Amino acid sequence: MIPELLLIDKPKGITSFGVIRVLRRQFREGRGIFLDELQGAREVASGDIGTGTVTDDTTAATQQVAKKIPRMGHAGTLDPLATGLMLIGIGPGTKKLTELVKLDKEYVAEIRIGERRTTGDLEGDVVEEKVVVDLTKEEVADALVTLIGEQELPVSAYSAIKVDGVPMYKRARKAEQKGEEVTEVPVRVMKVYEVELLKFEMAGDRAVATVRFFVGSGTYIRSLAEELGRRLNYPATLQNLRRTKVGEFDIKDAKQLDDF
């Protein structure tokens, strides 16, 4: 039976909608994540229940079942460079996405201290640099604690938030083509429940802090990364991001996009 909700571990380098495209292709071709689910459906359709025999009727039934690609959607976008947990609604499960997107989330982020980029992550161009000198793990940990609570922070100019019906990232890319930078961005209230400094190390004239964040829905980790830098008097950007939990759903229960 096809599940209504699928937990996927998104790999780096693919958009969130790209994950949907891969899943639709897997369903259509009756392979990958959907292989076991479609096996039962095709046996029922062909009358070969429990035989394990692949006949022309079974193959035809597989093609017939796979033609009926259900509607799919996801509960919360992950940027192309980010990895981790995505909740995919399938068929009737898409009706649950509106509520699922409101769930709290946990992330593990690597924050590069000493540079700021146009996009707030490594996709963008460096626009500010500062050599990191004498910064300690204790100073970073203390600054992180000050982020707990509600913070009014600017969102990334490359976020999916719409302004006058147009996603911010489309405005930013259009400005980039003209050699300009979007400086007027919306400010959002972001909720941070927990922070934990997992690791701190120097990397040349930069520093990298690995941080676990437990946050409310609508909180942008790129914004928190840049704000951490400001509180340390350094520019900062997001180096890597992995979503590990959405509500009670955990990355350890997620499936891989094994054919991507």
PLM feature spans:
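Catalytic/RNA-binding core of pseudouridine synthases
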Residues: M1-F260
